C-alpha cells in the first residue's frame, strides 16, 4: 500500500511539474491534450501566429501525399568494413591505411523545419517552364512541387549506386533478387517452389527509371546537378513559402541549451520533433468516436 501511495504521489509531482513547464513556456495545459504531437502543434501555432492554408483540391492533396515515402535506415551496400591505421594496435603497415568514421547530423529535424516551407497560395501551374523552376532560388517567395519522370544514365550509376537518390515505395520483383536472396527466401519459405512470393511495397532506392515521381524543386535541382535527367513534367504545383516554423524551432533549441536537467533537455527536443510528426500525419485515418450511455444517441450515431 505504501509503495502504491509513493508511486502515485511521485508521478503526480512529475506531471504537475510538466504542466508548469508547459504553461510557463507555451501558455498551454498538457492535461487538455491526448498526445504530445497535438500539444506541440498547438504550441507552434500559438507562438508563430501562422495561418496555414488547407488543401481542398483532391488531386493536389494526393500528389502532395505521394511525397511522403518514409525514411531509409541504411546508407550503402557494404555490411562489413575494417579500419587499418597507425592509431590501431593491429595496424598493418603493408596494407592501405583507412579509417571508419561515424557521422551524425545535429538538429536534423530542426534544420529541415527551419527552411522555407509552403503555407498558402497552392495552385496548379501551366505556364511555368522547367528552366524557370530549376533557376528558382532556395529562398524565393514562390516554391514548387513537380510530378515528373526521371532517368538515371548509366554513366552516373557507379557514383550513385551506394546511395541512390529518390527512393520509391514499390513492389520488388523476383527478377531483381540476387541468387543469395532467392536462396534465403526459399529456405525461409517466403519464396515457394514455383518461385512465387507475397510481395509487399518497400521503400527502395534504385537507379531505374522513375515514373510520375513527385519531388520538391530544391531536391530536383540537386539531383539534376548529380546528372539525373528529367524526361517529362506531368504537373507543377506552386506555393508561397517562408521559414514560418523557424521561430518555434529556434525557441525550443535555445531553451534546450539553457536547460539544467535531463527532463527539460528531452522535453524541448520532443516539442520540435513532435511537430515534424504532426506535419506527416495521415488525417485519412482519423475517425469520429462518440461515447454515450444513452440508447437514443447510440442508435442515432
Predicted regions and their residues:
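Conserved acidic
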Residues: 1-301
Amino acid at each position: 500500500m505504501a509503495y502504491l501511495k509513493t508511486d502515485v504521489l511521485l508521478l503526480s509531482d512529475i506531471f504537475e511539474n510538466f504542466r508548469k513547464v508547459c504553461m510557463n513556456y507555451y501558455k498551454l495545459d498538457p492535461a487538455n491534450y491526448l498526445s504530445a504531437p497535438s500539444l506541440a502543434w498547438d504550441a507552434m501555432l500559438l507562438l508563430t501566429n501562422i495561418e496555414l492554408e488547407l488543401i481542398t483540391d483532391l488531386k493536389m492533396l494526393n500528389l502532395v501525399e505521394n511525397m511522403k515515402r518514409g525514411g531509409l535506415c541504411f546508407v550503402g551496400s557494404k555490411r562489413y568494413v575494417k579500419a587499418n591505421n597507425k592509431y590501431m594496435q593491429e595496424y598493418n603497415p603493408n596494407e592501405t591505411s583507412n579509417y571508419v568514421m561515424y557521422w551524425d547530423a545535429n538538429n536534423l529535424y530542426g534544420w529541415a523545419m527551419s527552411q522555407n516551407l509552403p503555407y498558402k497560395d497552392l495552385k496548379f501551374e501551366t505556364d511555368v517552364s522547367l528552366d524557370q523552376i530549376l533557376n528558382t532560388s532556395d529562398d524565393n517567395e514562390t516554391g514548387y512541387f513537380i510530378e515528373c519522370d526521371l532517368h538515371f544514365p548509366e554513366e552516373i550509376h557507379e557514383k550513385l549506386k551506394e546511395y541512390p537518390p529518390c527512393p520509391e515505395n514499390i513492389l520488388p520483383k523476383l527478377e531483381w533478387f540476387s541468387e543469395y536472396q532467392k536462396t534465403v527466401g526459399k529456405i525461409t519459405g517466403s519464396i515457394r517452389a514455383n518461385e512465387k512470393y507475397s510481395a509487399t511495397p518497400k521503400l527502395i532506392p534504385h537507379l531505374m527509371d522513375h515514373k510520375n515521381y513527385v519531388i520538391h524543386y530544391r531536391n530536383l535541382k540537386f539531383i539534376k546537378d548529380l546528372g539525373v535527367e528529367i524526361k517529362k513534367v506531368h504537373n507543377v504545383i506552386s506555393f508561397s513559402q517562408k521559414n514560418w516554423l523557424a521561430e518555434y524551432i529556434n525557441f525550443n533549441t535555445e531553451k534546450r541549451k539553457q536547460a539544467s536537467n535531463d527532463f527539460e533537455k528531452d522535453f524541448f527536443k520532443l516539442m520540435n520533433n513532435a511537430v515534424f510528426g504532426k506535419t506527416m500525419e495521415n488525417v485519412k485515418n482519423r475517425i469520429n468516436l462518440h461515447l454515450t450511455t444513452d440508447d437514443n444517441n447510440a442508435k442515432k450515431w
